[in-house]
Regions:
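N-terminal leader/auxiliary helical segments
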Residues: 1-31, 35, 39-212
Length: 212
Protein backbone atom coordinates (compact mmCIF):
# COMPACT_ATOMS: atom_id res chain seq x y z
CA UNK A 1 0.00 0.00 0.00
CA UNK A 2 1.41 3.38 -1.06
CA UNK A 3 0.77 4.93 2.37
CA UNK A 4 3.31 2.58 3.96
CA UNK A 5 6.15 2.93 1.46
CA UNK A 6 8.70 5.69 0.93
CA UNK A 7 7.39 8.18 -1.61
CA UNK A 8 10.73 8.48 -3.39
CA UNK A 9 10.43 4.84 -4.50
CA UNK A 10 7.19 5.75 -6.27
CA UNK A 11 8.73 8.86 -7.82
CA UNK A 12 11.61 6.79 -9.20
CA UNK A 13 9.05 5.07 -11.44
CA UNK A 14 7.60 8.41 -12.48
CA UNK A 15 10.75 10.28 -13.51
CA UNK A 16 11.26 8.43 -16.84
CA UNK A 17 7.52 8.61 -17.58
CA UNK A 18 7.46 12.40 -17.21
CA UNK A 19 10.67 12.79 -19.22
CA UNK A 20 8.93 10.90 -22.03
CA UNK A 21 5.54 12.65 -21.81
CA UNK A 22 6.90 16.11 -21.04
CA UNK A 23 6.41 18.56 -18.19
CA UNK A 24 3.47 20.14 -20.01
CA UNK A 25 1.52 16.86 -19.97
CA UNK A 26 -1.69 16.21 -18.03
CA UNK A 27 0.06 13.28 -16.34
CA UNK A 28 2.67 15.65 -14.90
CA UNK A 29 -0.05 17.99 -13.62
CA UNK A 30 -1.72 15.02 -11.90
CA UNK A 31 1.60 13.90 -10.42
CA UNK A 32 2.31 17.37 -9.01
CA UNK A 33 -1.11 17.24 -7.38
CA UNK A 34 -0.17 13.90 -5.88
CA UNK A 35 3.01 15.45 -4.46
CA UNK A 36 0.79 18.05 -2.75
CA UNK A 37 -1.32 15.17 -1.40
CA UNK A 38 1.82 13.42 -0.14
CA UNK A 39 3.09 16.53 1.65
CA UNK A 40 -0.25 17.31 3.31
CA UNK A 41 -0.83 13.71 4.37
CA UNK A 42 2.67 13.14 5.74
CA UNK A 43 2.60 16.40 7.71
CA UNK A 44 -0.93 16.05 9.09
CA UNK A 45 -0.80 12.30 9.72
CA UNK A 46 2.23 12.82 11.94
CA UNK A 47 -0.26 14.46 14.31
CA UNK A 48 -3.54 12.68 13.43
CA UNK A 49 -2.43 9.04 13.64
CA UNK A 50 -1.15 9.14 17.26
CA UNK A 51 -4.00 11.50 18.24
CA UNK A 52 -6.60 9.05 16.92
CA UNK A 53 -5.56 6.50 19.57
CA UNK A 54 -6.99 8.74 22.28
CA UNK A 55 -10.45 7.95 23.64
CA UNK A 56 -13.22 9.57 21.61
CA UNK A 57 -10.95 10.49 18.71
CA UNK A 58 -11.31 9.17 15.15
CA UNK A 59 -8.87 9.63 12.27
CA UNK A 60 -11.48 10.33 9.59
CA UNK A 61 -13.61 12.49 11.87
CA UNK A 62 -10.65 14.74 12.72
CA UNK A 63 -9.93 15.17 9.01
CA UNK A 64 -13.61 15.83 8.37
CA UNK A 65 -13.71 18.47 11.10
CA UNK A 66 -10.75 20.19 9.50
CA UNK A 67 -12.56 20.10 6.14
CA UNK A 68 -15.54 21.75 7.86
CA UNK A 69 -13.26 24.42 9.32
CA UNK A 70 -11.67 25.25 5.95
CA UNK A 71 -15.00 25.30 4.09
CA UNK A 72 -16.64 27.56 6.67
CA UNK A 73 -13.56 29.79 6.63
CA UNK A 74 -14.12 30.28 2.87
CA UNK A 75 -17.82 30.98 3.35
CA UNK A 76 -19.26 27.64 2.21
CA UNK A 77 -21.96 25.51 3.82
CA UNK A 78 -19.81 22.57 4.91
CA UNK A 79 -22.78 20.23 5.41
CA UNK A 80 -24.09 20.45 1.85
CA UNK A 81 -20.95 21.38 -0.11
CA UNK A 82 -20.84 19.20 -3.29
CA UNK A 83 -17.40 17.75 -2.64
CA UNK A 84 -17.85 15.15 -5.39
CA UNK A 85 -17.42 17.89 -7.99
CA UNK A 86 -13.74 17.86 -7.05
CA UNK A 87 -13.37 14.29 -8.34
CA UNK A 88 -13.44 14.43 -12.16
CA UNK A 89 -13.96 11.16 -14.03
CA UNK A 90 -13.73 12.38 -17.62
CA UNK A 91 -11.63 10.64 -20.27
CA UNK A 92 -8.76 13.15 -20.08
CA UNK A 93 -8.41 12.71 -16.32
CA UNK A 94 -8.61 8.93 -16.57
CA UNK A 95 -5.91 8.90 -19.26
CA UNK A 96 -3.61 11.15 -17.20
CA UNK A 97 -3.93 8.85 -14.18
CA UNK A 98 -3.42 5.82 -16.41
CA UNK A 99 -0.11 7.25 -17.66
CA UNK A 100 1.10 7.89 -14.10
CA UNK A 101 0.22 4.37 -12.96
CA UNK A 102 1.31 2.61 -16.16
CA UNK A 103 4.22 0.83 -14.34
CA UNK A 104 1.67 -0.68 -11.94
CA UNK A 105 -0.60 -2.12 -14.66
CA UNK A 106 -3.66 -0.19 -13.49
CA UNK A 107 -6.28 -0.32 -16.23
CA UNK A 108 -8.42 2.60 -17.37
CA UNK A 109 -11.49 0.57 -16.44
CA UNK A 110 -10.34 0.26 -12.82
CA UNK A 111 -9.46 3.95 -12.68
CA UNK A 112 -12.90 4.93 -13.98
CA UNK A 113 -14.60 2.59 -11.50
CA UNK A 114 -12.58 4.04 -8.62
CA UNK A 115 -13.31 7.67 -9.55
CA UNK A 116 -16.98 7.02 -10.26
CA UNK A 117 -17.30 5.11 -6.99
CA UNK A 118 -15.73 7.96 -5.04
CA UNK A 119 -18.09 10.47 -6.67
CA UNK A 120 -21.11 8.27 -5.94
CA UNK A 121 -20.33 7.72 -2.25
CA UNK A 122 -19.29 11.33 -1.65
CA UNK A 123 -22.63 12.45 -3.10
CA UNK A 124 -24.56 9.79 -1.18
CA UNK A 125 -23.03 10.85 2.15
CA UNK A 126 -23.43 14.59 1.60
CA UNK A 127 -26.71 15.63 3.18
CA UNK A 128 -28.08 18.34 5.43
CA UNK A 129 -30.61 17.94 8.20
CA UNK A 130 -32.86 15.57 6.27
CA UNK A 131 -34.57 12.20 6.20
CA UNK A 132 -31.69 10.95 4.04
CA UNK A 133 -29.21 11.71 6.85
CA UNK A 134 -31.42 9.98 9.42
CA UNK A 135 -31.77 6.84 7.30
CA UNK A 136 -28.03 6.61 6.50
CA UNK A 137 -27.02 7.08 10.14
CA UNK A 138 -29.60 4.49 11.21
CA UNK A 139 -28.25 1.97 8.70
CA UNK A 140 -24.69 2.62 9.92
CA UNK A 141 -25.75 1.90 13.49
CA UNK A 142 -27.91 -1.18 12.95
CA UNK A 143 -25.16 -2.77 10.82
CA UNK A 144 -22.54 -1.93 13.49
CA UNK A 145 -20.45 0.06 11.00
CA UNK A 146 -21.02 3.47 12.54
CA UNK A 147 -17.53 3.85 14.04
CA UNK A 148 -15.83 2.84 10.79
CA UNK A 149 -18.04 5.03 8.59
CA UNK A 150 -18.73 7.99 10.86
CA UNK A 151 -15.97 10.11 9.37
CA UNK A 152 -17.31 9.76 5.84
CA UNK A 153 -20.38 11.89 6.58
CA UNK A 154 -20.00 15.29 8.19
CA UNK A 155 -21.95 15.67 11.42
CA UNK A 156 -24.37 18.58 11.82
CA UNK A 157 -22.42 19.92 14.80
CA UNK A 158 -18.66 20.06 15.24
CA UNK A 159 -17.01 17.76 17.78
CA UNK A 160 -16.06 19.37 21.09
CA UNK A 161 -12.36 18.71 20.50
CA UNK A 162 -12.37 20.16 16.96
CA UNK A 163 -11.30 23.66 18.00
CA UNK A 164 -8.03 22.27 19.36
CA UNK A 165 -7.31 19.72 16.62
CA UNK A 166 -8.16 22.23 13.88
CA UNK A 167 -5.71 24.75 15.33
CA UNK A 168 -2.92 22.18 15.26
CA UNK A 169 -3.85 20.93 11.78
CA UNK A 170 -3.96 24.49 10.46
CA UNK A 171 -0.30 24.90 11.42
CA UNK A 172 0.57 21.69 9.57
CA UNK A 173 -1.55 22.82 6.62
CA UNK A 174 0.24 26.17 6.33
CA UNK A 175 3.62 24.47 6.59
CA UNK A 176 2.55 22.03 3.86
CA UNK A 177 1.81 24.83 1.39
CA UNK A 178 5.39 26.11 1.45
CA UNK A 179 6.89 22.63 1.63
CA UNK A 180 4.84 21.41 -1.35
CA UNK A 181 6.10 24.33 -3.42
CA UNK A 182 9.70 23.51 -2.47
CA UNK A 183 9.33 19.81 -3.24
CA UNK A 184 7.57 20.39 -6.55
CA UNK A 185 10.45 22.60 -7.70
CA UNK A 186 12.90 19.98 -6.44
CA UNK A 187 11.13 17.18 -8.30
CA UNK A 188 11.02 19.28 -11.46
CA UNK A 189 14.81 19.65 -11.29
CA UNK A 190 15.19 15.90 -10.79
CA UNK A 191 13.17 15.31 -13.97
CA UNK A 192 14.70 18.02 -16.16
CA UNK A 193 18.26 18.16 -14.81
CA UNK A 194 18.76 14.71 -13.31
CA UNK A 195 19.31 16.04 -9.79
CA UNK A 196 18.77 13.64 -6.84
CA UNK A 197 15.43 13.77 -5.07
CA UNK A 198 15.03 15.81 -1.89
CA UNK A 199 15.51 13.71 1.26
CA UNK A 200 12.02 14.72 2.41
CA UNK A 201 10.63 12.37 -0.23
CA UNK A 202 12.14 9.44 1.70
CA UNK A 203 9.12 9.42 4.03
CA UNK A 204 5.63 7.96 3.78
CA UNK A 205 2.13 9.41 3.60
CA UNK A 206 1.78 8.39 7.25
CA UNK A 207 4.60 10.47 8.73
CA UNK A 208 7.18 13.16 7.99
CA UNK A 209 9.87 11.11 9.73
CA UNK A 210 12.55 9.58 7.42
CA UNK A 211 12.36 5.80 7.15
CA UNK A 212 16.10 5.38 7.88
Amino acid sequence: HQHSHAFDAFLAYEQPIIRKLGTDSAAYAYLLGYICHFVLDSECHTYIIPKSTEAGKNHLVMENEFDRFLLKKDGYNAISYPIWHMIPNDKATIHAIYEVYRPFALSKHKIKRALSGMRFYKKLLTCGCSLKRFVIRLLMKITFYYKQLEGHMMTLCAKSYAKHTNAVLLKHYKKSIFLANELILDFHKSVTQGKPLHKRFHTTLKSNEPLD
